[in-house]
Amino acid sequence: MEESEYESVLCVKPEVHVYRIPPRATNRGYRASEWQLDQPSWSGRLRITAKGKVAYIKLEDRTSGELFAQAPVDQFPGTAVESVTDSSRYFVIRIEDGNGRRAFIGIGFGDRGDAFDFNVALQDHFKWVKQQCEFAKQAQNPDEGPKLDLGFKEGQTIKINIANMRKKEGAAGAPRTRPASAGGLSLLPPPPGGKMSTLIPPSGEQFSGGSLVQPVSGSGGATELWPQSKPAAAATADIWGDFTKSTGSPSSQSQPGTGWVQF
């Protein structure tokens, strides 16, 4: 193990109990009911640490922190840590001393939550170890790893809907030109129910209903506006024309001193 590897703490539980377990006579699993659960051999603190790929279950005194026993775990689940068959709060661990001696002891937690955290801490550590091994293999042989194929398979098609894009392009077209008004100003529409204002013509002439009106002096000095009648047609200008043709007179005007028309 390299000297540069540091030790990290994975889990700490303030109370754990240690039990002596009887030798297993058969290959069946351990049963916590066969232990003397009311008489634990030792009680203290449990701490799980990791250094490199190996996890360590350490049983320490809860006051002084003195190490009571230690169980190295290089694989989980495995022979280093086993669960009992009749409870989720008890486990069998394999402890080792510095001289190479090994022994199996039973540990138990008073709370099921502590037992769950103990189990999950070991699972997460060895899941991380497995990922590190896979990354190392891929780094050594990058060509052997799975390649991501983004190409189209034979006969495979893709459909793209660009209806929204066309709508956006039409909305973002050339802006509509506004009609220019005289003087750079535009006339506002009249308010609802109001009357349109009339344009003021030059002095001496006025418009009324679309026809030109000339001022006519009337009584009292007031100016009255009368529509200028259109001249009659030339064919009907002289109503006495048929009578004057017989006498050869070109005029239909009355003679001076008489009120009769000459026939």
From Swiss-Prot:
GO terms for cellular component: clathrin vesicle coat; clathrin-coated pit; plasma membrane. Expressed in brain, heart, kidney, liver and lung (at protein level). One of its GO terms (biological process) is endocytosis. The modification Phosphoserine is found at S181. InterPro entries: NECAP_PHear, PH-like_dom_sf. It comes from the Eukaryota. A motif (WXXF motif 1) lies at residues 218-221. The keyword Metal-binding does not apply. It is found in: Cytoplasmic vesicle, Clathrin-coated vesicle membrane; Cell membrane. A motif (WXXF motif 2) lies at residues 238-241. Residues 167-191, 209-263 are annotated as: Disordered. The keyword Metal-binding does not apply. Keywords: Cell membrane, Cytoplasmic vesicle, Endocytosis, Membrane, Phosphoprotein, Protein transport, Repeat, Transport. The WXXF motifs mediate binding of accessory proteins to the ear-domain of AP-1, GGAs and AP-2 through hydrophobic interactions. Selective binding to the GAE domains of AP-1 or to the alpha-ear domain of AP-2 is tuned by the acidic context surrounding the motif and the properties of the second residue of the motif itself. Interacts with AP1G1 and AP2A1 components of the adapter protein complexes AP-1 and AP-2. Interacts with the GAE domain proteins GGA1, GGA2 and GGA3. Involved in endocytosis. Belongs to the NECAP family. PANTHER family: ADAPTIN EAR-BINDING COAT-ASSOCIATED PROTEIN 2, ATP-BINDING CASSETTE ABC TRANSPORTER-RELATED. This is Adaptin ear-binding coat-associated protein 2. The lineage of its organism: Eukaryota, Metazoa, Chordata, Craniata, Vertebrata.
